[in-house]
Structures are given as structure tokens and as C-alpha cells.
Swiss-Prot record:
A Pfam family annotated for this UniProt entry: Cystatin
Subcellular locations according to the entry: Cytoplasm
Name of the molecule in the record: Cystatin-A2
GO molecular function ontology, one term from the record: cysteine-type endopeptidase inhibitor activity
Motif Secondary area of contact: positions: 47-51
Cystine crosslinks: none
Stored InterPro entries: Cystatin_dom, Cystatin_sf, Prot_inh_stefin
Organism of derivation: Dictyostelium discoideum
Function according to Swiss-Prot or TrEMBL: Intracellular thiol proteinase inhibitor. Inhibits cathepsin B, but not papain.
Lineage, broadest ranks: Eukaryota, Amoebozoa, Evosea, Eumycetozoa, Dictyostelia
GO biological process, one term: regulation of proteolysis
Location (main, coarse): cytoplasm
Family listed: Belongs to the cystatin family.
Swiss-Prot/TrEMBL keywords: Cytoplasm, Protease inhibitor, Thiol protease inhibitor
Length: 95
């Protein structure tokens, strides 16, 4: 079990996280400044705060990126930050 505030273990993509990423796709495209029609969720970690931070590794047309998406306990998800230029084997860490 992950303690509050700590990053959890890495999980493979699942429907829940894919839906969260899809909900913020316009923001992702705006931050990356490129077409993300082929965006694919690879893996993710979570952090329990006053809601959940999702740290998500995605494959884009240009390589890989890490996303931080915040989802409150009740309400819509929002994109907080993007790290572009990542590699397939880069570990997901807090940013």
C-alpha cells in the first residue's frame, strides 16, 4: 500500500487511466505543440494527495512523454505538467 504523498508502484496502462488521459488530450496537444492523434498510454504511477496525481508515460509520434494529471476526488481531471523528450526506459518520477 502506498503511503499518502508517496508515489506508488508502476502499473501498466488500463482503461481508467486511458480515459483520464483522453479527457485532457486538448491540453496535452497544446503543451506539446504537436499532433497527438496516435497517443498511447504505456504505464503510470499514482500519488494520493487531496485527490490523485497520475504520472503517466505516453508514446507520441515523436517519442515518449511523461504527464502529470491531477484528478480531485470529485470533479474533472486537469493536466498539470508535461515532460517531453523522454525515452522508453526512463523511469516515471515526481515532477
Amino acid at each position: 500500500m502506498t503511503k499518502v504523498g508517496g508515489l506508488g508502484a508502476t502499473h501498466q496502462a488500463d482503461k481508467t487511466v486511458e480515459d483520464i488521459v483522453n479527457a485532457v488530450k486538448p491540453s496535452i496537444q497544446s503543451k506539446l505543440g504537436t499532433n497527438i492523434s496516435n497517443l498511447k498510454v504505456i504505464s503510470y504511477k499514482t500519488q494520493l494527495v487531496n485527490g490523485t496525481n497520475y504520472f503517466v508515460k505516453v508514446r507520441t509520434e515523436n517519442g515518449y512523454a511523461h504527464l502529470r494529471i491531477y484528478k480531485p476526488f470529485s470533479g474533472a481531471a486537469s493536466l498539470v505538467s508535461v515532460q517531453d523528450g523522454k525515452a522508453k526506459d526512463d523511469e516515471i518520477t515526481y515532477f
